From Swiss-Prot:
Organism of provenance: Escherichia coli O6:H1 (strain CFT073 / ATCC 700928 / UPEC)
Function text: Catalyzes the phosphorylation of N-acetyl-D-glucosamine (GlcNAc) derived from cell-wall degradation, yielding GlcNAc-6-P.
NCBIfam families: PRK13310.1
Family recorded in the similarity comment: Belongs to the ROK (NagC/XylR) family. NagK subfamily.
Alphabetical list of PROSITE patterns matching this protein: ROK (PS01125)
EC number: 2.7.1.59
UniProt keyword Oxidoreductase present: no
Record protein name field: N-acetyl-D-glucosamine kinase
Broad enzyme group: transferase
Origin superkingdom: Bacteria
Pfam families: ROK
SUPFAM superfamilies given in the database record: Actin-like ATPase domain
This protein's record includes keyword Transferase: yes
Length: 303
């Protein structure tokens, strides 16, 4: 059995998957915020409960926001303060007497989608998250590409390309990002960026769901806004695709629930790609909230 943990600032979610990649059991508990020992106990107790329930010693994978293992072997995860700065992988591997694998939550999202029954035919899968921020991951032959610093797939911290500034206007504001840089694309393409663009052009502070509701009602202003957003997304994604050249792009995050994102994007991409490039298949994520657990569990699938 494959045990997958999706760990965030408020909850520890465990999903148990069988050899057919089907979810058999899941359980959630609150994430301890202050005590590392309590955090380790919470994870180990869930593993012990799963072992008893299924009568086996399942493999353990964990998806967590941040950098799963720094140069000194410790976790960096600002949203999980009880475990940040601690040698989480080594400590859990020792306590559970098995190989525990960690990856960041964006890679786990991408891995979950790459192992969807319909998507396993594609060697190179790119996961793109358009949510509170912009992120994602790359999966090659069923394995995540992490890079030395676990930042592969941090697409949101690419800066706006020149052709985006040409399209939006050379006086378009380069907003300061939380990473400290200016002009990172997540400030324009995330859910918050979607709302910011609307306010920038129309001087109305609406949230993304409100704008999308207006779009669905045929509001001309909202429709013009969506056209502009999709054009900007296509420009930025075109730059990424020229480097990555995936077979499949799977889009997750809150904005993936807006059908125009996946249905109207492909037709805008060719003019931003090399003439010989083929547009990848573009799909909405299939596994929703379970994706983090699935991807974490599947860190062991290619053993």
């Amino acid at each position: 059995m494959y045990y997958g943990f999706d760990i965030g600032g408020t909850k520890i979610a465990l999903g148990v998957f069988d050899s057919g990649r089907q979810l058999q059991w899941e359980k959630r508990v609150p994430t301890p915020r202050d005590s590392y020992d309590a955090f380790l106990d919470a994870v180990c107790e869930l593993v012990a409960e799963a072992d008893r329930r299924f009568g086996c010693k399942g493999s353990v994978g964990i998806g967590i926001p941040g950098m799963p293992e720094t140069e000194d072997g410790t976790l960096y995860a600002a949203n999980v303060p009880a475990a940040s700065g601690k040698p989480l992988r080594a400590d859990l591997s020792a306590r559970l007497d098995r190989d525990v694998r960690l990856d960041n939550d964006a890679n786990c999202f991408a891995l979950s989608e790459a192992w969807d029954d319909e998507f396993t035919q594609y060697p190179l899968v790119m996961g793109l998250i358009l949510g509170t921020g912009v992120g994602g991951g790359l999966i090659f032959n069923g394995r995540p590409i992490t890079g030395k610093s676990y930042i592969t797939g941090e697409f949101g911290h690419m800066r706006l390309p020149v052709d985006a500034l040409t399209m939006m206007g050379l006086d378009f504001p380069l907003r300061r990002c939380g990473c400290g840089q200016y002009g990172c694309i997540e400030n324009y393409l995330s859910g918050r960026g979607f709302a910011w663009l609307y306010q920038h052009y129309y001087h109305q502070p609406l949230q993304a769901p409100e704008i999308i509701a207006l779009y669905d009602q045929g509001d001309e202003q909202a429709r013009a806004h969506v056209e502009r957003y999709l054009d900007l997304l296509a420009v930025c994604l075109g730059n990424i695709l020229t480097i990555v050249d995936p077979d499949l792009v799977v889009i997750g995050g809150g904005l993936s629930n807006f059908p125009a994102i996946t249905t109207q994007l492909a037709e805008r991409l060719p003019r931003h790609l090399l003439p010989v490039a083929r547009v990848p298949r573009i799909e909405r994520a299939r596994h929703g909230d379970a994706g983090g657990m699935r991807g974490a569990a599947f860190l062991h699938l290619t053993d």
